[in-house]
Amino acid sequence: MRSNMIKKGPEQAPARSLLHATGQIKSPEDMNKPFIAICNSYIDIVPGHVHLRELADIAKEAIREAGGIPFEFNTIGVDDGIAMGHIGMRYSLPSREIIADAAETVINAHWFDGVFYIPNCDKITPGMLLAAVRTNVPAIFCSGGPMKAGLSATGKALTLSSMFEAVGAFKEGTLTKEDFLDMEQNACPTCGSCAGMFTANSMNCLMEVLGLALPFNGTALAVSKERRALIRESAFKLMDLVKRDIKPKDIVTKEAIDDAFALDMAMGGSTNTVLHTLALANEAGIDYDLERINEIAEKTPYLSKIAPSSSYSMHDVHTAGGVPAIINELMKREGILHPDRMTVTGDTLRDNNAAYTIQNEEVIHTLDNPYSEHGGLSMLHGNIAPLGGVIKVGGVDPSIQTFTGAAICFDSHDAAVAAIDNHTVRPGHVVVIRYEGPKGGPGMPEMLAPTSSIVGRGLGKEVALITDGRFSGATRGIAVGHISPEAAALGPIALIEDGDMVTIDLVHRTLNVDVTDDELKQRKARLQPFKAKVKSGYLARYTALVTSANTGGVMQIPEHLL
C-alpha cells in the first residue's frame, strides 16, 4: 500500500502517534487498512456545495464498511453565478488550478491509497479531475447533483439562465418588477448545481462517459435518496479499485477524451467543457488535435436539448433515462463511442449502460429523430481564430447558418455591457470583446452578462458576439468564445477595428474578418505590447504562466526555466 510510507516501520512511530491523534484510527488493525482521502468541496456560499458535508459523512461510513480508513479534506470553490460581472469572475478559472494543486499536495504529502472526489460546480469538478490524473492514485468521482428547476408564480420553468436574461428584459421594460422579484425568489429552489446544462452539470455528465463516475452521477438530484445511494455505491467501488490498483490514467485515454466530446455534442454541453477537457488531455499527456473535435461533431447527433436551449432541466433528463440512456443510444451507431473501454466499475462503458433505454423521446431524442445530425458544439477557425474558437451551435437559432455584421470593439467586458445597455450596440453588430482571455482578463472571465443582455433585449438573432473570454453554460445566441491566440498574446482578435465586416459561418465552421493579410500585418506592427493588469498576488502569477484557450488555459512553466 502507498500509505505504508507513513505508517509502517519504527521510523514512522511519530507519524503513527499523529495519526492516532486524528481520531480516525479506531484500533491497531486500522494501520493495516487502506487510507482513503475524501477530497470534498463543502462551502456555505455555493448552493451546489452546501450539502456536501452530509455526503462526505455517508462516504466515510461506507468506506469504513468496505475496509478502508477515511480522511476528509476540503478544497476551495468559487460560485460563478455570484462572482459574475465583477473582479470575482477573474478568479473563477484560475481557481481550477488552485484546486488541482491543493488536492495534489494533500494526496501526495500523505500517501493515500485511494481518493473519493466530491465536487459539483463549475471549476471544482475539472480542478479535481486534473488532480486525479496528475496524482494517478485509484479514484472515483461522485458529484453533489443538480438542484430542482424553479417555477414562477405563472407556472413557467426557471433556471439561473432565466434570471440572467430577466435582467436584460427588466432593464428594457418588458418585465414587471413583480415578475422580476418572483423569478429571483424562485429560480434556484434547492441546493445543488444549477438546473440546466450549464458547466457544472455538463462536466458531471462527462464524468460518466469518461468512466470516472457511476451511471446517473450527472443527473440524480442533490436532494434525492438516489444521490445518497450513489455516494455509498461509489465508496464500495472505490475500495475495489484500490484492491485492483486501477488508476485514473488506465481510464482516461485518448478514446475516453473522444467519448467525452461525443457526449458533449449529443447533449449540447457548455463550451467550457472544451476548455476543461483539453486541459485534461494536456494533464494526461495526451496529444489532442482540435480538429478531432469537429470530426466528432460531424458523426455525433444532437439528441438532448436542455436549458438554456430548451425548457427541460437536468431532472427531466434523469427521468427520461439520464446519461446512460444517451450513451446506450449512441452505442447503437458504430463509430461514435468506444464502448469497450475500462471504467471505475471494473466493467466497460458498454456493460455500464447497455440496460438503460430512453423513457421520454421528447426529452432525449433517438438516433432516428435527432435535433440535428451534428453535435451541439463546433470549433471555428479563420483569420480571427487561427488556433480556434468555440460556439455552442445548439444554443443558436436553427434558422441562422451564417452571420455577417459590422464589428464594434471593446477591450473589456464592462465597456461592452455598458454599450449594450445604452443601446450603442444595435442590430447587425458583431460585438468584439477582447483582452479577456486567460492572460488578458486575467482569468478568462465569462461573458454571460453581455450575452444575456443581448438575448434579454430581443436581439439574440440580430447581434453576434465574439471574444477571447469564455461563456457560462447558461449562454445562448450567436456567441463565439475561447478565440485563440488571445489578444494579450497578440492574437488577430486584437487587430479588428470598428466597422470591419466579420462573418461567422456555422456550415463551414469559419470565423473571418474581411481584411487583407497585408492590412492585418500592418495593424499588428502598430499593436502595443500587452501589459499585465494585475501586478501582485495569485492573479499576477497566473498571468505570467497561463496559456491560451486552445491548450485548455493551463499554466505552464516556460521551457527556459525547466
Curated annotation (Swiss-Prot):
Keyword entries, A-Z: 2Fe-2S, Amino-acid biosynthesis, Branched-chain amino acid biosynthesis, Iron, Iron-sulfur, Lyase, Magnesium, Metal-binding
Residues that bind [2Fe-2S] cluster: 121, 194
Biological process terms in GO annotation: isoleucine biosynthetic process; L-valine biosynthetic process
Keyword Lyase set for record: yes
Reactions the enzyme catalyzes: (2R)-2,3-dihydroxy-3-methylbutanoate = 3-methyl-2-oxobutanoate + H2O; (2R,3R)-2,3-dihydroxy-3-methylpentanoate = (S)-3-methyl-2-oxopentanoate + H2O
Residues noted as binding Mg(2+) in the record, renumbered to the chain: 80, 122-123, 446
Record InterPro entries: Dihydro-acid_dehy_C, DihydroxyA_deHydtase, DiOHA_6PGluconate_deHydtase_CS, ILV_EDD_C, ILV_EDD_N, IlvD/EDD_N
Family, per entry: Belongs to the IlvD/Edd family.
Summary of the function given for this chain in its UniProt record: Functions in the biosynthesis of branched-chain amino acids. Catalyzes the dehydration of (2R,3R)-2,3-dihydroxy-3-methylpentanoate (2,3-dihydroxy-3-methylvalerate) into 2-oxo-3-methylpentanoate (2-oxo-3-methylvalerate) and of (2R)-2,3-dihydroxy-3-methylbutanoate (2,3-dihydroxyisovalerate) into 2-oxo-3-methylbutanoate (2-oxoisovalerate), the penultimate precursor to L-isoleucine and L-valine, respectively.
Protein name: Dihydroxy-acid dehydratase
Organism: Macrococcus caseolyticus (strain JCSC5402)
Gene name of the encoded protein: ilvD
